[in-house]
Amino acid sequence: MTIVAFQGEHGAYSEEACRKHFGDDVMTLPCRTFEEIFSAVESGQADFGAVPVENSTAGSINKSYDLLLDHDLKVHGEILLRVRHNLLVVPGKTGEIRQVRSHPQALAQCESYLNRRKLAAVPWYDTAGSAKDLAANPVEGVAVIASKLAAEVYGLEVVEEGIEDMPNNYTRFFVVGKGEPPRSTRSKTSLVFAVPNTPGSLYHALGEFATRQVNLTKLESRPRRNRPWQYVFYVDLDGHWQEEHISAAIVGLLNRAAFVKLLGSYPAAPPLEQESIAGQSALLQI
């Protein structure tokens, strides 16, 4: 059975992402930190890890990108998870809600909902953790914001679904593992590089992709740790590194860059439009 490590308690959105990618029968391994995910995969305790790398509203998750640079694991896949926040209570305690607990980011993403109802927001260490703690120690007038999976895991009641302020709230995850993933018909490639601190160096580096018609879907700079005011550049592009024009672009980049690290070529997640259509079809069948 496949074992996948994730950060958080059982019922976390990261565990939901694991189930979406690997199926409901996957065995999941909760980890306290992102570092523990990488350690679990490297030690063989888990086959893969699911690491959040980007949120459609909050942007990139820098810690994850730093760990991808520091470790030798490869990206084996990506997951695009629609994050739907739900208001959960202990069954039988659906009276007046005065206080809502959750992770600070979840509270921020539901700020308008909470303000309209004049609910006091109380930060908690984890969305699923807030559900776990409330189930263990029920408190009158207290609810939590978490996933429907957390409600199932801890036996809580969903009072209201989809309370997030922005409905198109997605988190992108990388599936990390050892070795190279099998090649797929629709691939993406992620890499990181640095260029010499000279005029035009970044322009010429990116030109290796442009002249070969390689489509870059993401370009982001990050500070190089222990090297003030020096930067590395993270790139996502369409295609597999073994495709002739992409491998030629990477060879050209190697000749211009101070260093290049290939994070992996992996199956791309289904486009959001397809997921939206599938979701609408499912609603019509209800």
Per-region residue spans from a language model:
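Domain-level signature for soluble enzymes in the chorismate/prephenate branch of the shikimate pathway
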Residues: 1-286
